[in-house]
């Protein structure tokens, strides 16, 4: 049995998007589950729209997500490469001309105005969907030769009549499309660049791709691609078309929707846990047989069955992704966090207490950095208008009177809180909020005694002076 090979083939016209990351992830999981190979190749023929760091964004951010390719432009295998379409232009052109020689394709000499005229004629006839008619263009043989000599033509593949293109979709089951709904279509544009549906087939054949998981927008591309496989007498891969990802209102994710971060680098920069996103994206259109949510990298690979891919759209719930990231960060050893954030200069006991206290409630490292900043800048921030009412001031004064700065510890601070509670017969928010505001200058936070202790006796004593 031949090795299972999957691929992710982005265009470097933009950065790695949530949808692209999920597509790459599912192809990666399918390959790894069956001990196959996962390939990244770059479809960079849309030169005008390519951006300088588009390719790097795709590969580097996938690597950050722990989605590493067996082969890519950075790890080429000569047997299957090149891994950028821009390096294969001559090959696409050569195969297109071979199809002409075999009678499967032809040169189409229409210019843009003539093609537009044919479309308008089709509309007048009431044709719902335009299909190119190869005998519509009426030009002289002399004009045809002139255009041929100057390369003013595209190459179209001949769409066979009354043919059904059928495949057993890995996600959706049986799908069939009648060729009469397609028409002849362009495989090489007038600038000698290949169209997507032509180049992608050549690439998949060259790289011996056996399974393809991709977005549902590619369903209409599949019969065109199957046509090329047939003309080249090449075995077809198995196709699977994933459902869309929507926002919480059920609308398809749009890159123009600025209310939601949609690019992986944005979550990386904010300090989300990469394995948490890997875990979260896996469940965005796939369910575990045992209904587990939190699974590590190897567990997910072992459990991944494509038969459990969803046929229904998946909602991108940012709150759920934050929950995943929170679970991963709070279970991350302190030593690892110290290394990631370069916190070696801090006192070991202090930084471990800080991390134990705050990592429980963060979903991003930026949050942790902001909490750390509160302590780092404490000396610069000794005064604050707290706007306490008389009852709250009384709580702070009582607490202040019980603190022993010569014996400053978490236990001693907790004892001062307890004595204040007993003296004033209060509890909950009425007890904790005034003390937290007066000592930490925050209204919310983790366990109060520990949060106060981390400031150190000197800073707390200065902040308590006004309450004596």
From Swiss-Prot:
Residues that, per the record, bind ATP: 255
Catalytic activity: tRNA(Glu) + L-glutamate + ATP = L-glutamyl-tRNA(Glu) + AMP + diphosphate
Record keywords, A-Z: Aminoacyl-tRNA synthetase, ATP-binding, Cytoplasm, Ligase, Nucleotide-binding, Protein biosynthesis
Gene3D superfamilies hit by this protein: 1.10.10.350, HUPs (3.40.50.620)
Gene Ontology annotations of biological process type: glutamyl-tRNA aminoacylation
Motif 'HIGH' region mapped to chain: 10-20
Superkingdom in the source lineage: Bacteria
Entries under InterPro entries matching the protein: aa-tRNA-synth_I_cd-bd, aa-tRNA-synth_I_codon-bd_sub2, aa-tRNA-synth_I_CS, aa_tRNA-synth_I_cd-bd_sf, Glu-tRNA-ligase_bac/mito, Glu/Gln-tRNA-synth, Glu/Gln-tRNA-synth_Ib_cat-dom, GluQ/Sye
Listed GO MF terms: ATP binding; glutamate-tRNA ligase activity; tRNA binding; zinc ion binding
Function: Catalyzes the attachment of glutamate to tRNA(Glu) in a two-step reaction: glutamate is first activated by ATP to form Glu-AMP and then transferred to the acceptor end of tRNA(Glu).
NCBIfam families from the UniProt entry: gltX_bact
Name of the protein described by the UniProt record: Glutamate--tRNA ligase
Gene name tied to this protein: gltX
